[in-house]
UniProtKB/Swiss-Prot annotation:
InterPro entries: CyaY, Frataxin/CyaY, Frataxin/CyaY_sf, Frataxin_CS. The keyword Iron applies. CDD domains: Frataxin. PROSITE patterns: FRATAXIN_1, FRATAXIN_2. GO terms for molecular function: ferric iron binding; ferrous iron binding. The gene is cyaY. GO terms for cellular component: cytosol. It comes from Aliivibrio fischeri (strain ATCC 700601 / ES114). This is Iron-sulfur cluster assembly protein CyaY.
Length: 104
């Protein structure tokens, strides 16, 4: 994968996260600054998601720790847990919000 393809794939996922949050009605504020998407919660906690272009990875930092995702078999998979990226984002959002979120 080249850098252009990497950015297109990651941007698609970041937009999906924003859309999912909007559709859920959860009190989460997504803020994009450069290559970083920060999800800010009512309790002032944050999830930080960023593009790591040199490694072609997505990194996610939350109160559960730091996670790296690589694009394998057409999906972003965590090197530590084997979990798919969007599923982990949903799980971490629920932990940070301290409530069940109704994902569309």
């Amino acid at each position: 994968m080249n850098n252009t393809e990497f950015h297109e794939l990651v941007d698609e996922k970041l937009q999906l996260i924003e859309d999912m949050i909007d559709d859920s009605g959860a009190d989460i504020e997504p803020v994009i600054t450069g290559n970083v998407l920060t999800l800010e919660f009512e309790n002032r906690s944050q999830i930080v998601i960023n593009k790591q272009e040199p490694m072609h990875e997505i990194w996610l930092a939350s109160k559960s720790g730091g996670f790296h995702f690589s694009y394998v078999d057409e999906k972003w998979t965590c090197s530590k847990t084997g979990m798919e990226f969007i599923e982990m984002v949903k799980e971490e959002c629920q932990k940070h919000a301290d409530e069940e979120i109704e994902w569309a």
